[in-house]
């Protein structure tokens, strides 16, 4: 299932607008903070789907019954662009386990896209809820390869993908090719990719905007 959060008017859309704005992007601290806020809100929305149990909490004046989550998810992010989104999700799920994986485009000299997946640090995922954070879903290829690599650490009972912006083609590709039913939570879905497989209108390169241009 795909959840496009920006379709409902809220403060969330201001954060999406600011990460797109080429003038606001010049302030990398603000860019990172906005992605972090987006992660916090995506985490809040995902939290509504988790399992809860009524729990008694003692107050100074008595007891209160509150529905609390029965487990914390595992939050995985794709380095390096996913780190700010990861931090936002971790602000929401502050007792979550964490996983990190690298995925990057390797130049081929052609129009073909070659994605490399190398470093991985991940706990056992068996029967856990997994949230994979990546701010931009352009072609969906990186996410599909990361998905495959993470599943070598066990099969989660539920998987969520959290992204700020996705292309329509990436959404379609992931819906068709992911081996396990997955909920995709995204701020906005853009219709086009350019010749270099960047989302249009998108926002540019999220990793460079957050952490500086890479060599």
Short names for language-model regions:
Residues 1-215:
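PRPP-associated nucleotide enzymes
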């Amino acid at each position: 299932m795909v959840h496009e959060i920006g379709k409902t008017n809220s403060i969330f859309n201001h954060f999406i607008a600011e990460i797109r704005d080429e003038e606001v992007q010049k302030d990398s601290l603000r860019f990172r903070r906005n992605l972090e806020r987006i992660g916090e809100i995506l985490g809040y929305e995902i939290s509504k789907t988790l399992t809860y149990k009524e729990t008694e909490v003692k107050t100074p004046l008595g007891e209160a019954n509150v529905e609390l989550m029965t487990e914390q998810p595992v939050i995985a992010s794709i380095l390096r662009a996913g780190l700010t989104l990861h931090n936002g999700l971790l602000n929401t799920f502050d007792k979550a386990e964490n996983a990190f994986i690298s995925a990057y485009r390797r130049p081929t000299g052609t129009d073909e896209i070659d994605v490399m997946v190398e470093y991985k640090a991940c706990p056992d995922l068996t029967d856990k809820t997994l949230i994979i954070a990546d701010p931009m879903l352009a072609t969906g290829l990186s996410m599909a390869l990361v998905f495959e690599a993470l599943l070598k650490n066990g099969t989660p009972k539920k998987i969520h993908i959290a992204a700020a912006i996705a292309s329509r083609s990436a959404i379609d590709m992931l819906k068709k090719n992911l081996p396990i039913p997955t909920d995709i939570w995204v701020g906005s879905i853009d219709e086009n990719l350019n010749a270099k497989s960047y989302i249009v209108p998108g926002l540019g390169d999220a990793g460079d905007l957050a952490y500086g241009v890479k060599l």
